[in-house]
């Protein structure tokens, strides 16, 4: 959820390197999970990180060099503008950096696959059982839900943007940011492949970024824009279409069959907020990049529950301050900040 400089500033190179290595483990684990547990989540390899502004092309070069030299991450390929048509049918981009180790997947299918694996292993999942509050009691915790109470020796809070009033301290360190996506009608194999010939997922390095990929049934799934002041656009299709058609003008007027949205949990420094206090654990602050960081964080918390809290202690050294004035004032401040960076995205 974070670039490496904030991690290195808090933990030093060795500490940041350990968290980086944990992310590499998570990437390998994510590749193996569907095979190990027998489910499909549309896992596909390949990510193209693009630059729109001339001054941001250098960021691609810089990361390619730093990844190899400092973090041992090899294989990144710089894609010059004259090569981009082999990757993406858009004139919007000046250059790209291809990562053959990165991947994209369907997170809903991943969630269903993992849930089924948990139940096969004897785990129990209670859906639609909202936790209202909790308190310490004896050597454990008592959690009050809408349908009854639960007693437990250890409590893990993994609520992300939906922590709300369940834990006021944690909620003050998070800002729920609305994000939304659309999926086009099926484009047909030939037309879909013409948009992204190598079937990689694409993001750009703007502050307010676009991100998109193809689906197995030849739709374009596209996200762009966000809201800091709560809620969702009244018409997600209308809000997202200009971003999509800016990238792919050849899709102007295409039917958008699906539209949905939700909230991501942004921390002030965009660093993950993971830690413990006694037998109360928490995982949050993925800031829009939760698939791999949440797996790495879950491993750290699982290890701590089993007696090894070394990695969790590293995470807990990351500084995650409260938003000034709490969420009431954080959203307007973040919206102002977003407006500033959106202006910077133009030049």
Protein language model features and the residues they cover:
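Dinucleotide-binding Rossmann-like beta1-alpha1 core, especially the glycine-rich loop
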Residues: 1-81
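Helix-loop-beta segment of a Rossmann-like dinucleotide-binding subdomain
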Residues: 9, 13-15, 40-49, 83-117, ...
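Generic structural signal for well-ordered, non-membrane alpha-helical segments
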Residues: 16-19, 23-27, 56-60, 103, ...
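Active-site substrate-recognition segment that forms the wall
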Residues: 28, 36-44, 131-133, 149-278
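General small-molecule cofactor/ligand-binding pocket signal
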Residues: 42, 76-79, 124-126, 257-259
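Helical element adjacent to the flavin cofactor pocket in flavoenzyme catalytic cores
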Residues: 58-69, 91-153
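General beta-strand structural signal in soluble alpha/beta enzymes
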Residues: 77-80, 125-127, 145, 157, ...
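C-terminal catalytic lobe of FAD-dependent flavoproteins
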Residues: 226, 230-232, 237-346
